[in-house]
């Protein structure tokens, strides 16, 4: 444990001591606005309550003045909890929520500064100029295609969640030593009304974020996951040292470092040979492969089930030591890749094993060679996608298309554009599927839901509406996949209807998962 502590301290040499004074700088609130607050209460509420957007600078100055007054700062968020119709005037309710949102978003910008600087220095050190290409979600799947076919076991991991938010403050304190700033963080976590929405259920391992303070809570959760992975890096580096030295096979590798230090390797091999009456070959520790998205992760290896079990309890023990809470072992499930399929990033992935027989003729003798090939397979979980469409009110739970009443007041072009965009995005995201027939069922649901929505708007039936305008009206907005591929690739490359079902294409411009895919 002392070695772990020393390893952690080496990587935390840059600690920020002066972040709290940044809250009193006006440009921080301008940065918060530029980072995408146009769709939040920062400005939308000003329009709703009748305030002009130009008064935001004056409100920021008024907020900074109130921050200097400690009592005003303490009651600032508490005022936003109250209902504006009970004992609060129209102005007080707006000011309290407006100030609360400005502090929360600006706090998020400030707390990200030390980690942004650390990322920039890392990219310069590693000479990675175009790191944004690595942000694509689809970049994970070519990696899995290349690696998983050679591995044996995979551990499905649910990232554990802390019991108390004070744990998050304590691990953040290792990076930031500005005491007033950390006190303000505690204030956010314990006093905000939106704290009630900052939960983790037993079925899910990710936070349900508040809409108003989504950026702050997302940062805290991502930082916590980063710390969980930080322990994995430490364990992985310790394990990688073994690959530098050849060693004999030990059925029980307890106190392995002590045995190597105090005993001769040759003597240990002799002991093993005498006990098990066989000669053991030297070997290296197998490589481990780790991939994570949101609150789920997979750890794959070419090793044995015993090795994966030891890794499992390494994770559990280190999490308990470092975060001071009980981590249930059932959150890490070990499975054999050949008999296991896992849901990851909107795909149902598995390892297919195909056998082929080859007849070999040598002079007068012939024999048959059986060859096994492994292939990483990804298919679209149609049932889960239909469930997502059902939650979004595009169809029933059984997949029967229904109209979207909330969109009936839009123009025809807007309705067609929204349905067409959803359909194209789903086809774009699931372009890596090995079987795309299920996507055409999703396309049928969206097309008929669009037709029902338009018919509802014009107070007509679907058949009458399509007969009057023609079914070709929907074809323009639901672009076929073959047409999209023909625009992306040279004309010499032919994509037939049959081939498009098998062709897998991964895009490196997808930096976030589709909302409908994420719901499934």
Curated annotation (Swiss-Prot):
Name of the gene encoding the protein in the UniProt record: matK
Protein name from the UniProt record: Maturase K
Compartments where found: Plastid, Chloroplast
Biological process annotations from GO: mRNA processing; RNA splicing; tRNA processing
GO cellular component: chloroplast
PANTHER family: MATURASE K
GO molecular function annotation: RNA binding
Annotated function: Usually encoded in the trnK tRNA gene intron. Probably assists in splicing its own and other chloroplast group II introns.
Family note: Belongs to the intron maturase 2 family. MatK subfamily.
Main location per the UniProt record: plastid
HAMAP family: MatK
UniProt entry keywords in alphabetical sequence: Chloroplast, mRNA processing, Plastid, RNA-binding, tRNA processing
Pfam families found in the cross-reference section: Intron_maturas2 (PF01348), MatK_N (PF01824)
């Amino acid at each position: 444990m002392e070695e772990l502590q020393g390893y952690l301290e080496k990587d935390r040499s840059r600690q920020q001591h002066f972040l709290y004074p940044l809250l009193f700088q006006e440009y921080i609130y301008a940065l918060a606005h530029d980072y995408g607050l146009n769709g939040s209460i920062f400005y939308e509420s000003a329009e709703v309550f009748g305030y002009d957007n130009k008064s935001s600078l004056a409100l920021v100055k008024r907020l900074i003045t109130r921050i200097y007054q400690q009592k005003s700062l303490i009651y600032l968020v508490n005022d936003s909890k109250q209902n504006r119709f009970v004992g609060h005037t129209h102005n007080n309710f707006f000011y309290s929520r407006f100030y609360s949102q400005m502090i929360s978003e600006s706090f998020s910008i400030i707390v990200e500064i030390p980690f942004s600087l650390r990322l920039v220095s890392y990219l310069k050190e590693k000479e990675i100029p175009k790191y944004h290409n690595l942000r694509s979600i689809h970049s994970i799947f070519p990696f899995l295609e290349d690696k998983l076919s050679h591995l044996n076991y995979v551990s499905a991991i649910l990232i554990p969640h802390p019991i108390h938010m004070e744990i998050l403050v304590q691990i953040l304190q290792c990076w930031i030593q500005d005491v007033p700033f950390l006190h303000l963080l505690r204030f956010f976590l314990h006093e905000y009304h939106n704290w009630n929405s900052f939960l983790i259920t037993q079925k899910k391992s990710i936070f349900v974020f508040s809409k108003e303070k989504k950026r702050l809570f997302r940062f805290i959760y991502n930082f916590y996951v980063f710390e969980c992975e930080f322990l994995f890096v430490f364990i992985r580096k310790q394990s990688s040292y073994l690959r530098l030295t050849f060693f004999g096979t030990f059925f029980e590798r307890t106190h392995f470092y002590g045995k190597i230090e105090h005993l001769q390797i040759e003597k240990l091999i002799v002991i093993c040979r005498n006990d098990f009456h066989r000669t053991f070959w030297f070997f290296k520790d197998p490589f481990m492969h780790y991939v994570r998205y949101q609150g789920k992760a997979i750890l794959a290896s070419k090793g044995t089930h015993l090795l994966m079990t030891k890794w499992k309890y390494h994770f559990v023990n280190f999490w308990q030591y470092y975060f001071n809470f009980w981590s249930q072992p059932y959150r890490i499930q070990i499975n054999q890749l050949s008999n296991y399929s896992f849901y990851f990033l909107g795909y149902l992935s598995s390892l297919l094993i195909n056998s082929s027989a080859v007849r070999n003729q040598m002079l007068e003798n012939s024999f048959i060679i059986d060859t096994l090939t492994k292939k990483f397979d990804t298919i679209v979980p149609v049932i889960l996608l239909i469930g997502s469409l059902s939650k979004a009110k595009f169809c029933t739970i059984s997949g029967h298309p229904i109209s979207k009443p909330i969109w009936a007041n839009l123009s025809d072009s807007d309705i067609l554009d929204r349905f067409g965009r959803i359909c194209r995005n789903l086809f774009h995201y699931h372009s890596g599927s090995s079987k795309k027939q299920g996507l055409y069922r999703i396309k049928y649901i969206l097309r008929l839901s669009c037709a029902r929505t338009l018919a509802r708007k014009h107070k007509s039936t679907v058949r009458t509406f399509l007969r009057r305008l023609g079914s070709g009206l929907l074809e323009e907005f639901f672009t076929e996949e073959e047409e999209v591929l023909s625009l992306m690739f040279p004309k010499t490359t032919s994509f037939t209807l049959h081939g498009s079902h098998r062709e897998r294409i991964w895009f490196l411009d997808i930096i976030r998962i589709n909302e409908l895919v994420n719901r499934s």
